[in-house]
Amino acid sequence: MSKPAMRVAVTGAAGQIGYALLFRIASGEMLGKDQPVILQLLEIPDEKAQKALKGVIMELEDCAFPLLQEVTAHADPKTAFKDADVALLVGARPRGPGMERKDLLTVNAQIFTAQGRALNEVASRNVKVLVVGNPANTNAYIAMKSAPDLPAKNFTAMLRLDHNRALSQLAGKSGKAVAGIEKLIVWGNHSPTMYPDYRFATVDGQPLAKLINDEAWNRDTFIPTVGKRGAAIIEARGLSSAASAANAAIDHVRDWVLGSNGKWVTMGIPSDGSYGIPEGIIYGFPVTTANGEYTMVKDLEVDAFSRERMDFTLKELLEERDGIKDLLK
């Protein structure tokens, strides 16, 4: 007997990341090869965007995916999020010429306040929300604060792209296969201030730090390379990283829904006060996932260098939060 379909809402659905994401969701890569899906796709109420969305839907139809039960187009979050089991908030206002970061925060605060309120009103009470649109941690915080009737733990931000980028760099440096590396962490904000931390990482069960015993490489090459990878891709491609971002979103939700089989993964989640991170801040932490829930990996040792890096990325998150505080009243 087939499972009941899961409703997946995706915002910014006609954008680059949306285009790289939707076909993989519809093929069963995110929720399982036996899980039917209904896609509820949101775009801005602009004629060009809605027309582009119709084109994407035509292509989805033309794939004849066995798991795709229905696809609908929306311009209003209140219809797009109706009964959603999963919501991928991909659409956000990109930084335009001459825009300061605080201007970007203000514009996105309006978008994510409206979307948080709509989720609060119409989504499933168990909805799993992943914010991909930048600044992802603070946008997730805004949506969470705008949805007081939903559990705070339902709101997450995407650090998985940083996690995957760090995995790839470590595999290259150690000469080992990426699949063998476990227990990597990316702490903090999805921004160049993030702290990728491989102190606990293993490769094929052995400590990775024994293979890469190089503090200068860690500080001067590894951390900046992971932090600035997005900018490097824009420089090379002329466009932002869309396929790798979509891939990370699939990884994040797949592990959240289907479980990580005991492996550590990085998710931006509301802090419970652990590791000196103030409660409620959406911060990248190591988690394991099972039965549709994530559990933070606790009581890891924090050395002086790590404390400094963790506090540095926290400072940025607190500044972002303070920048939008008045907009949440």
Curated annotation (Swiss-Prot):
* Record-listed E.C. numbers: 1.1.1.37
Q: Which residues form the signal peptide?
A: none
A Gene Ontology molecular function term of the record: L-malate dehydrogenase (NAD+) activity
Keyword Hydrolase applies: no
Q: Which top EC class applies here? A: oxidoreductase
Amino acids binding substrate: 95, 101, 134, 165
Superkingdom of this protein's organism: Bacteria
Pfam families linked to this entry: Ldh_1_C, Ldh_1_N
In which residues is NAD(+) bound?
12-18, 108, 115, 132-134
Q: Which GO terms describe its biological process?
A: malate metabolic process; tricarboxylic acid cycle
User: What's the catalysed reaction?
Assistant: (S)-malate + NAD(+) = oxaloacetate + NADH + H(+)
Check the record and name the InterPro entries matching this protein: L-lactate/malate_DH, Lactate/malate_DH_C, Lactate/malate_DH_N, Lactate_DH/Glyco_Ohase_4_C, Malate_DH_type2, NAD(P)-bd_dom_sf
Name the catalytic site residues.
190 (proton acceptor)
Q: CDD domains from the xrefs?
A: MDH_chloroplast-like
Q: Could you confirm whether the keyword NAD appears in this record?
A: yes
Keywords annotated in UniProt:
NAD, Oxidoreductase, Tricarboxylic acid cycle
HAMAP family hit by this protein: Malate_dehydrog_2 (MF_01517)
Its job: Catalyzes the reversible oxidation of malate to oxaloacetate.
Q: Which family does it belong to?
A: Belongs to the LDH/MDH superfamily. MDH type 2 family.
Family matches, as NCBIfam families: MalateDH-SF1, PRK05442.1
Q: What is this protein called?
A: Malate dehydrogenase
Q: Which organism is it from?
A: Bordetella avium (strain 197N)
